[in-house]
Amino acid sequence: MQEEQEFIAQLLNLKTQNQAFQKLIVDYQRPLYNHIRNIVLNHDDTDDVLQNTFIKIFQNLKNFKGESKLFSWMYRIATNEALSFLKQKAKKSGISSETLQNKVIDNLEADIFFDGNEIQIKLQKAIALLPEKQQLIFKMKYFEELKYEAISEILGTSVGGLKASYHIAVKKIEAFVKTN
């Protein structure tokens, strides 16, 4: 924790800020990319959202209160940016977020950055049927292998509530996979 506080101090100090922010990007670019990609599913869109996420992190570092881990705070920003991006994209297209997500899933097979097979496409279709919060919880637990405590910090939900949502999501996905 002391090490994180020192790093945050470097991020806020004008003399060390650039070097510290470069380290932050190097350390967190891959996990944040993967997290955002799990939400928006498209490589190019993920790159755009990731860039916006780092801009927002940089702009808001002075407001970071240290009530959660830096990692959790950045994940929360990335999650909000990804969800906002999807809502804006759906609004621009004049369709619902669910319809947009189904279109993106249909395009996954043509995405050169997606190396999944038929089963993974089916899994993504099942996930798309879940409510937004269950999707997030499932993806963070299943794909990113985050602990419930970390997800709780990121989403601001109790661990018990997360476990229940994850369990319900798993049951819905199992039912979809069995019937399709």
Regions found by a protein language model. Give the residues of each.
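DNA-recognition helix of helix-turn-helix
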Residues: L83, Q134, M140, E149, ...
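Amphipathic, Lys/Arg- and hydrophobic-enriched alpha-helical face
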Residues: I25-H43, N60, I127, F176-T179
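Internal acidic/polar
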Residues: E4-E6, K92-N117, A150
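N-terminal module of bacterial RNA polymerase sigma factors
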Residues: M1-P31, N38
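Hydrophobic-face residues of short alpha-helical interaction/recognition segments
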Residues: L32, I36, L61, M74, ...
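Sigma70-family region 2
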Residues: L41, F54-K69, K89
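Arg/Lys-rich amphipathic alpha helix in sigma70-family domain 2
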Residues: N63-K65, T79-S96, I168
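Structural recognition of an alpha-helix C-terminal capping motif at a helix-to-coil junction
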Residues: D48-I55, S68-N80
